[in-house]
Structure formats: C-alpha cells, structure tokens
UniProtKB/Swiss-Prot annotation:
Residues 97-117 are annotated as: Involved in binding TNC and actin. The lineage of its organism: Eukaryota, Metazoa, Chordata, Craniata, Vertebrata. The keyword Cell wall biogenesis/degradation does not apply. It comes from the Eukaryota. Residues 29-41 have a biased composition (Basic and acidic residues). Troponin I is the inhibitory subunit of troponin, the thin filament regulatory complex which confers calcium-sensitivity to striated muscle actomyosin ATPase activity. The gene is Tnni2. Residues 29-53 are annotated as: Disordered. This is Troponin I, fast skeletal muscle. Gene3D superfamilies: 1.20.5.350, 6.10.250.180. Residues 2-48 are annotated as: Involved in binding TNC.
C-alpha cells in the first residue's frame, strides 16, 4: 500500500504541474493576442483616420468644423441611399417569392386568427378609407309584434287564484274547459 500511495501522489503532483504549465502557456497566449489586437487597432486607426490637426485661429477651426460636417452629411446620404436600396431589393425579393409561389401553385398561407369585425369595419377594410359606407343591418329588418300565446293570456286573465278554482270546480267548470278547447 505504501508504494501505491506514493505512486498516486506522484501522479496527482504531475497532473497539477501539467495544469500549471498549461495555464502559464494560455496566459502568455492571451497576452500575445491582446497585444496583437491593440497593434491591429492602431494600424487601422492610422490608415483610416488622419491625425487631427487643430489650427490656432478661430476661422481655421470653423473651417475644419464645416469640412467635418460636410463629411458627416455625405456619410449620412450614403447611409440613406444604402437603406433605400436594401428596402427596394427586399421588396423585390418578396414580390419574386410571391410570383414563384403563384407559378408553382403552392401558396404560403399565414396563420390566421379569428377577428370579430363589424360590417362597417369590414367594408372599410375592403373598400379603403376613401369610401365612407355606413351599413346598418338592423334598419332593413321587419318589425314583428310578439303574439300572445294562450298560456300567457290565461295567466294574465286568471288574476286571483281563488276565482280560478271556483270557475273550474264542479261539472260546469269542466264543461267550460271542454267547450273552450273544441
């Protein structure tokens, strides 16, 4: 067991030593990478950004500001032109895709949701905002009076329940019921 413990300790010590060496190598690589990035950044800035020369007089500073503003305006115009081109090309792509689907006969159907919409809103959506159409669907409906059913009339006519019982009691009350039914 003594040899085995020494061996395990040697293995763990060797592992720790290898880990520390690997960490040192990684740290030096990171430092080299950082210095390389910094030098690339300096090279890029020196190539693309001319050194700033600030003149001494006020008129020269104003002239420099005007030049810088002109450059900014030109860059903004280019940016706007590029955005317009991108929008135009994306629109053309969408149109071409739609034509492609039409030619193939396969339509890409978007998922539709059920929307509650009044008739006026539907007409406005179909015809556009230029046409003002008010459609009252209830105006053309026929008005119907509710006819009283016999049961409702009986209930209204009954009034006091005692009178109802007296009328229906005996043979004459039964006779009246049969006469009214036929």
């Amino acid at each position: 067991m003594g040899d085995e413990e020494k061996r395990n300790r040697a293995i763990t010590a060797r592992r720790q030593h290898l880990k520390s060496v690997m960490l040192q190598i990684a740290a030096t690589e990171l430092e080299k990478e950082e210095s390389r990035r910094e030098s690339e950044k300096q090279n890029y800035l020196s190539e693309h950004c001319p050194p700033l020369h600030i003149p001494g007089s006020m008129s020269e500073v104003q002239e420099l500001c005007k030049q810088l503003h002109a450059k900014i305006d030109a860059a903004e115009e280019e940016k706007y032109d590029m955005e317009v081109k991108v929008q135009k090309s994306s629109k053309e792509l969408e149109d071409m895709n739609q034509k492609l689907f039409d030619l193939r006969g396969k339509f890409k159907r978007p998922p539709l949701r059920r929307v509650r919409m009044s008739a006026d809103a539907m007409l406005k959506a179909l015809l556009g905002s230029k046409h003002k159409v008010c459609m009252d669907l209830r105006a053309n409906l026929k008005q119907v009076k509710k006819e009283d059913t016999e049961k409702e009339r009986d209930l209204r006519d009954v009034g006091d329940w005692r009178k109802n019982i007296e009328e229906k009691s005996g043979m004459e009350g039964r006779k009246k019921m049969f006469e009214s039914e036929s």
